[in-house]
Amino acid sequence: MNPELGFSKALEAIEPIADEAPIVLIDGRTGSGKTDFALNLQNELFRILDQAPRLISMDDLYPGWGGLNEGALYLLRHILIPLSKNQTAYWNRYDWHAKSREGKLTSFSGGTPLIVEGCGSLSMASRELSDYAIWISAPEQIRRERFSERDGGIFDEFYEKWSSQEDEFYSTHRSAELSNLRIENP
């Protein structure tokens, strides 16, 4: 499904449950367009609901370039599991420059929709704790180009390392198959 139709389908599914503060997961390989899709969804839901959905980026949860699995577990332990128990979620953003989680504690108690975007957000465990899941894909060459363009090529050396973690994670969790909606973003 193309991005425009996918966006409409996502809104059709999420809008009726928006008052129930749904948890929406947006996953896909690096460079597939998850962040732009999530920001557009957040803005459109804000326009419709007159309340801003919370947006969490997995980039704030990974403990560095080797941390895709750890970031996925951090999402579960510190955000999704507490919210599933009607508790406040507390977490520290990972500081990629300081290479630590020390810093300001962030919290979220629910009450508005939550959108989590990023590689590893959609696992077997996280799917059980969410209300709607979206998988976004794009051809590998396009994803690689987007990855390089996003930060001016300064992180190109990490592409293969990250991609191999994605291979392992997605073959284990079969994230695309867990989604309610699959979008091809060429």
Range-by-range predicted roles:
Residues 37:
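Hydrophobic positions on the alpha1 helix immediately C-terminal to the Walker A/P-loop
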